């Protein structure tokens, strides 16, 4: 219920929004003021906002810690692209291993991180002073991103979604249950307001305990299909 109250409810009330494929796109068009995103997404963060008239305004990036529930434990999500050595010839496998060894050396990995926003993969390289010593040309925005990210890693327990059969399908269930449902219901609220209802009247159906319980039981039944 806490997730519902802190994601779905403000979304239906119009406090949260999602229009483009990525939230950094929504910042660029001025539709949102901030978002929770990955470190790599910050490399696409715009320096200007353009409104419907075509006028452009300069903006600055401010990086903040990921939000947490009050009195909650210190956890942060760890997610991103990975590398594996696939089946191949003996020479291909050896070459792949050598590349991974080279790529994960601190200096090489830091160069990649500064350019992409992906975090270094070793504890030694996840240090902003070490990063700046390797790449002195780091931009102010990337320095801010990596500095905050270092703190997130060191001050939190990192977790990730464990692999299980049909795990992507289960994840899609949750995405549709939260994101898609919230957007659809917000669209309905907008339509009702356009027809003359007050915001309170238009939102009432979706903010009831009955609506939450119906939603919860529906999601629960879908997720139970993936139990091992």
How would you label these PLM feature ranges?
Residues 124-157:
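An extracytoplasmic/periplasmic, membrane-proximal ligand-sensing/linker region
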Residues 29-41:
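Alpha-to-beta junction loops
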């Amino acid at each position: 219920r806490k997730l519902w109250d802190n994601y779905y409810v403000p979304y239906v009330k119009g406090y949260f929004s999602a229009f483009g494929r990525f939230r950094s796109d929504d910042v660029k068009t001025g539709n949102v003021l901030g978002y929770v995103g990955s470190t790599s997404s910050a490399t696409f963060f715009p320096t200007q906002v353009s409104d419907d008239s075509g006028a452009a305004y300069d903006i600055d990036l401010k990086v903040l810690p990921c939000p947490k529930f009050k009195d909650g434990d210190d956890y942060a999500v760890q997610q991103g692209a990975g590398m594996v050595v696939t089946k191949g010839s003996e020479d291909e496998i050896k070459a792949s291993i050598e590349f991974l060894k080279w790529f994960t050396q601190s200096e090489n990995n830091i160069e990649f991180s500064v350019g992409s926003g992906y975090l270094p993969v070793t504890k030694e390289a996840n240090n902003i002073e070490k990063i700046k010593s390797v790449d002195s040309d780091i931009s102010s925005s990337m320095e801010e991103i990596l500095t905050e990210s270092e703190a997130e890693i060191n001050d939190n327990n990192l977790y990730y979604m464990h692999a299980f059969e049909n795990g992507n399908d289960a994840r899609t269930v949750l995405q549709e249950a939260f994101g898609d449902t919230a957007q659809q219901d917000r669209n309905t609220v907008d339509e009702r307001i356009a027809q003359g209802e007050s915001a309170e009247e238009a939102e009432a159906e979706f903010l009831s305990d009955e609506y939450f319980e119906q939603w919860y039981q529906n999601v629960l039944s879908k997720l139970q299909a993936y139990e091992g």
